[in-house]
């Protein structure tokens, strides 16, 4: 069993923004999931991050945030000694060519806590970014969703029901062939980085403008002399990604 720790319940410097209209009240609407059988751990999630990075050998821990970067930024602010101990951060967030999905300029995860994202991107830790540019290439089409359901397992059925729920919103909003699978791109990159390609560029987060708050300003073309601080992924082999995902779901 994997222990679960509750982290921060609000952004570092602004009111919380949520997205029930996309993923439902639970964030996982669609399947009829059982209630969790394992309670939350007593320790705060930020303290768990700090303690783990201090306990394990430096350069052996990769952080994989799939939401706002509040917990990591808070840990970095509380215990700056852990920053050089992080091997890498692989995150789902941001956008460049795909522009925003919560505002015209900003992707949701970064927009929720732009102050935290700014801290993380300026930390000096090696960062790999899975932006909307690449997650919108990983579309759950009807055929791909049928492949999940055809596994004939509780996991395959639950995933198919979940992506069915997302698909209705995403197809209506974007006019695409299916729903983008955002978060699994991070895990897929850990297993098969060869499925992805991108550029080492400078990425900074807008924190001062009301109009473009939370925008990931990505110097894709290298038009500034700002130092590179992130591998910004721009392409995924979508067929290879879904083959990998279906194979791994079949093992559960």
Model regions and ranges:
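Glycine-rich, flexible loop/turn motifs
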Residues: 8, 18, 24-27, 36, ...
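Active-site histidine-anchored catalytic micro-motif
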Residues: 15, 26, 31-137, 142
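Short hydrophobic/aromatic-rich motifs at helix boundaries and adjacent loops
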Residues: 18-23, 88-90, 156-160
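A residue-level signal for conserved active-site and pocket-lining positions in enzyme catalytic cores
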Residues: 4, 120, 187
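Generic secondary-structure signature for well-ordered alpha-helical cores
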Residues: 1, 9, 54-58, 77-81, ...
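Conformational coupling and interaction surfaces
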Residues: 111-115, 130-252
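Short glycine-rich loop/turn motifs that provide flexible caps or phosphate-binding loops at active sites
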Residues: 6, 66, 92-93, 207, ...
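Metal-dependent C-N hydrolase catalytic cores
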Residues: 1-56, 228-229, 233-236, 246-250
């Amino acid at each position: 069993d994997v222990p679960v720790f509750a982290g921060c319940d609000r952004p570092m410097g602004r009111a919380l923004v949520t997205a029930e209209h996309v993923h439902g009240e639970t964030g996982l609407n669609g399947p009829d999931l059982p209630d969790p059988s394992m309670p939350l751990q007593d320790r705060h999630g930020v303290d768990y991050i700090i303690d783990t990075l201090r306990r394990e050998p430096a350069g052996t821990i990769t952080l994989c945030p799939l939401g706002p970067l509040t917990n990591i930024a808070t840990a970095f602010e509380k215990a700056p000694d852990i920053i050089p101990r992080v091997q890498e951060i692989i995150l789902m967030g941001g956008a460049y060519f795909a522009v925003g999905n919560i505002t015209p300029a900003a992707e949701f995860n970064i927009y929720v806590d732009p102050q935290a994202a700014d801290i993380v991107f300026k930390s000096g830790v090696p960062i790999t970014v899975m932006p909307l540019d690449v997650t919108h290439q990983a579309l759950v089409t009807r055929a791909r969703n049928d492949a999940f359901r055809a596994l004939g397992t509780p996991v395959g059925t639950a995933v198919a029901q979940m992506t069915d729920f997302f698909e209705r919103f995403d197809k209506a909003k974007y006019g695409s062939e299916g729903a983008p699978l955002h978060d699994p791109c991070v895990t897929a990159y850990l297993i098969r980085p060869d499925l992805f390609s991108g550029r080492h560029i400078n990425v900074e987060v807008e924190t001062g403008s009301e109009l473009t708050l939370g925008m990931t300003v990505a110097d894709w073309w290298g038009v500034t002399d700002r130092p590179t601080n992130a591998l910004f992924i721009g392409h995924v082999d979508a067929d290879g990604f879904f083959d990998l995902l279906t194979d791994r779901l079949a093992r559960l």
